[in-house]
Amino acid sequence: NSKLWNKRKDKYGERLYFSKKLIENTKYLFDDNFILGYRMGGNEPELENGIENAKILESYGLDILHVSSGVPNPEYKRQVKINNFPKDFPLDWIIYMGVEIKKHVKIPVIGVSKIKKESQASWLVENNLLDFVAVGKAMISQDKWMENAKKDFSLRKK
């Protein structure tokens, strides 16, 4: 789907054509109870393009979007790979892309990247910045991560 990498000249070179066909055929195979999600690069190559792609993907009938980073152009050497990343945003630029994309779609959005503490994940969900947060390395490296995540937060059952 990336304009940086997909150089095909046929219909599969069109932005999101392959994704559209994949979504259509998957929806054909399963009933309406099947939740269909899609992991997307939020920077294709910039956040504005990711927002545009998210809206198109939503129109194809997806149930949930999982926003990560796109595969960068090897010539793209910046550490933060989007323009206009606010300096006061307390978390990673990849999480920020998910937060921004959520503002433009109606389906749930999952964010990911460098969530080290359960309080970070809770802050994102409790402030309606994201619907879900994917956590990987922190759960492996911190044996008490899940236990700490069970602490009382405003959205959790008491």
Per-segment meaning from a language model:
Residues 1-158:
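Flavin-dependent oxidoreductase catalytic cores
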